[in-house]
Amino acid sequence: MKFSFFDRPSEDRPMLALCLLFFGVSLMSLQDSLIKLFAPHTSFWQLQLIRSSFNMLFAIGLAALAGGFHLLWPRRLWPAVARGVLLAACMLCFFGASQQITVAQMATGLYTYPLFITLLAGPVLGERIGSWRIGALVLGAAGCLLALDPFADGGSYFQLVPVLAGFFYACNVLVLRRYCRTESPLALAFVVALIFMLTGLGGAVGLEAFKAPASWQQAVPFIFVGWPPLAIGTVGVFACFSALNLIGNLFLSRAYQTADSSWLAPLDFIYLLFVAMWGRVLFESWPAPLAWLGMAMIAAAGIVTAMREQRRDPSSAPPAQAGSGRRE
């Protein structure tokens, strides 16, 4: 029997969609903050391998509930694989410096992705970039410099690493828009989980076989340690991360199926506020006033970009994929 949660809604329900969006974003931001908190006890490669294994199991279970295992295989394999590789690079850059910077700085760097979409949409998709989107690009870039401020006393170039995550996420969006618009969300999720599992396995095996210099391991252990000791409790923590990821994605996808994405997508930038809140609760850190201003400028730039995109082509993205932010 097909699970009713996957049935497409028969009518728009904006308030329900808003609640689903807020709940989904809060779970995704909590997952990201908890991964940073747990980073000293694991490695990126171990996290990717085990968490993505749980994601694959959950995806298989959802396919069984939703109508069949055929939903797990994409119609066009290689674009889906390319998207998975881009998202793996995004995750590496997003979490790679998690022990050196705050969770708010991680989120700020990632949420520059609408600016990269604006830069790449012309040469990649042949879209015309108007004055509004150019203005949003300048505003967002200025906000990024304010929020991250890597050149201040005590600043670090690690603060710029999540901006690379924003670039790779933008590339993923363009691949999704051009080649994967008709794919099943479960197929896309399954392929991403498979790519994450393979990259996690490759990184762990490679770094165990060819040890990184000790100075690198001490400076960035989350990346340059292949496979630290694994406890049963750690596996349980990874399962919780996977569950948060799955539930958050389900609520976000359902939100965009239940209301018009033209007004929901800008609200997705509340992720930055949730991340700041979790940073305060878990790490007792709070963004400085200039960082708040920079985050607001990035959010404003993203909102302008989203609104102009909807005005240009209201059907430019499938409902379940129209939102902002990292979803894997």
Report the location of each language-model feature.
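Membrane-interface interhelical linkers
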Residues: 1-26, 56-82, 131, 198-239, ...
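Glycine-/small-residue-enriched transmembrane alpha-helix faces in small-molecule transporters
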Residues: 2-46, 153-178, 318-328
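Hydrophobic/small/kink-forming positions within alpha-helical transmembrane segments
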Residues: 25-30, 60, 84, 88-92, ...
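Juxtamembrane C-cap of transmembrane helices in multi-pass membrane transport proteins
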Residues: 29-42, 47-50, 92-103, 109, ...
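Hydrophobic/aromatic residues within transmembrane alpha-helices
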Residues: 38, 47, 97, 103, ...
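Helix-helix packing/entry segments at the starts of transmembrane helices
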Residues: 107-112, 179-195, 246-280
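C-terminal transmembrane-helix exit sites in multi-pass transporters
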Residues: 113-138, 273-292
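Hydrophobic transmembrane alpha-helices of multi-pass small-molecule transport proteins
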Residues: 132-149, 290-309
